[in-house]
């Protein structure tokens, strides 16, 4: 055997090992409005999605659960969610309700006059779960409400808007407690919030720590395409993981697969073996950390394109 062939075989073995390590961590995927509604409308679309995701060892879907294009299936046709969640559960998969929408401009929900909309959005999920059969209930909630998307986000307004996010989150968590339900609720959170110290309810600490205190878990938008070194997945998650370890909370590492600038934000353009190697390094670093909740991929359509299994055209 030539050295080149031997080296190639060794590389393949190492990548396979990295992939097998990464497979041990839970994997989830964000499924946004159009793809979620397509799965809810057509069971065959959902079944095809389950097949692909299970082949890629993805065990949890963050399924959109609010209004889209004039419909709100959670309220108007809850049986569609019943059927979807039952089918996922029958395959051993979990389903979290995904809340927040670019179409609905939900970044505005951090504003005091609109925070009640965020609570109402969650309350609809809680009401659905209370009425649904056990096998058709959501397993958790993830909300993606990003105040930095507001036009008014700037240095002078940032503290006020972040306090609004915390007030909104506190109100949402109170609604969950009042419901008597125990499903975990947590936000998508940028990794850079750990660099912003904020006074809130008598305590000054990084915004990330306030959020971890408030919620059951965080999905950390840790959008980098290498595991180690400066400006990496591990470096940007370090403070959140350390704090969550101390507080008994969970951090799910969010990774990006869609095109973006700069290129370091996403695995787009890399091959799947390279991604698995980086994911394996993250899990190797965190496998003994109680805070590590696995990975969540952004997003369903982008991830499917990345692995060479694009969403079929309608």
Region annotations inferred by a language model:
Residues 223-226, 247-314:
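Substrate-binding cleft of secreted/luminal carbohydrate-active enzymes
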Residues 22-53, 298:
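Boundary/entry segment of secreted carbohydrate-active catalytic domains
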Residues 96-102, 165-203, 249-258:
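Aromatic-lined carbohydrate-recognition surfaces of secreted/lumenal glycan-active proteins
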Residues 41-49, 78-83, 124-129, 191-210, ...:
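Alpha-helical scaffolding within the catalytic cores
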Residues 112-141, 207-211:
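An active-site-proximal structural segment forming one wall of the substrate-binding cleft
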Residues 65, 125-160, 296:
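Active-site groove signature of glycoside hydrolases
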Residues 170, 181, 185, 220-263:
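Glycoside hydrolase catalytic-domain groove-lining segments
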Residues 139, 145-149, 203-232:
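Aromatic- and acid-rich polysaccharide-binding/catalytic face
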């Amino acid at each position: 055997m030539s050295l080149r062939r031997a080296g190639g075989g060794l590389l393949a073995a190492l990548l396979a090992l990295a992939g097998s390590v990464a497979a041990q961590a839970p994997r989830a995927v964000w499924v946004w409005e159009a793809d979620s509604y397509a799965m809810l409308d057509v069971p065959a679309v959902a079944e095809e999605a389950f097949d692909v995701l299970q082949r890629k060892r993805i065990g949890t879907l963050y399924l959109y659960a609010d209004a889209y294009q004039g419909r709100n299936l959670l309220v108007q046709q809850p049986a569609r969610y019943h059927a979807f969640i039952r089918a996922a559960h029958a395959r051993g998969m979990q389903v979290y309700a995904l809340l927040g929408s670019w179409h609905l401009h939900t970044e505005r929900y951090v504003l005091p006059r609109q925070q009640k909309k965020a609570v109402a959005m969650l309350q609809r999920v809680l009401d659905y779960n209370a009425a649904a059969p056990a096998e058709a209930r959501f397993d958790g909630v993830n909300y993606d409400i990003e105040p930095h998307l507001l036009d008014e986000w700037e240095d002078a307004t940032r503290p006020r808007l972040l306090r609004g996010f915390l007030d909104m989150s506190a109100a949402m968590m109170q609604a969950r407690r009042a419901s008597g339900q125990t499903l975990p609720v947590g936000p998508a959170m940028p990794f850079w919030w750990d660099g912003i110290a904020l006074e809130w309810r008598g305590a000054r600490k990084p915004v990330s720590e306030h959020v971890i205190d408030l919620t059951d878990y965080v999905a950390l938008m840790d959008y980098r395409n290498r595991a180690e070194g400066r400006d990496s997945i591990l470096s940007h998650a370090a403070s959140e993981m350390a704090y969550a370890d101390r507080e008994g909370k969970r951090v799910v590492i969010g990774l990006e697969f869609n095109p973006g600038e700069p290129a370091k934000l996403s695995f787009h353009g890399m091959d799947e073996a390279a991604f698995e190697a980086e994911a394996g390094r993250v899990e190797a670093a965190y496998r003994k950390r109680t805070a590590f909740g696995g990975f969540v991929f952004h997003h369903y359509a982008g991830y499917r394109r990345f692995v060479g299994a694009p969403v079929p055209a309608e």
